Amino acid sequence: MSLNRRVFTQTIAAVGVTAAAPAMAAATIEVTMKNNPKAIFVPATVNCKVGDTVTWTNPGVITHSVTCDPAQAVDKANAVLPAGVQPFDSNNMEQDATFSHTFTVKGTYKYICKMHEAMGMVGTVVVS
């Protein structure tokens, strides 16, 4: 086999292996709403990548929300999202309810529980 044909064959083989490699699967990150001794998100800050999903779960009897909307926050600094991104809101989450959001834009998202923002129930998602 000539040198040019061998290089061509090796190049095609390498491209085929690269093209066949599976894409990295999107991750799902879990956040739990806790009530004792105070209302908090656990963990309070999560890091994820574009395409990942965060799922919040309320295992307790106290109603909570996941609200990333400055218009609904008492302190606008507690609900922040990247420019051009639409706000999101779980609405009221009763016991055992879950809410999921897939992040498609890089940036820092600060969110609140509408019922407990004044008590410090705030969280952050950092998307890279």
Residue positions per predicted region:
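Extracytoplasmic copper-binding redox domains, predominantly the cupredoxin/blue-copper superfamily
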Residues: 3-128
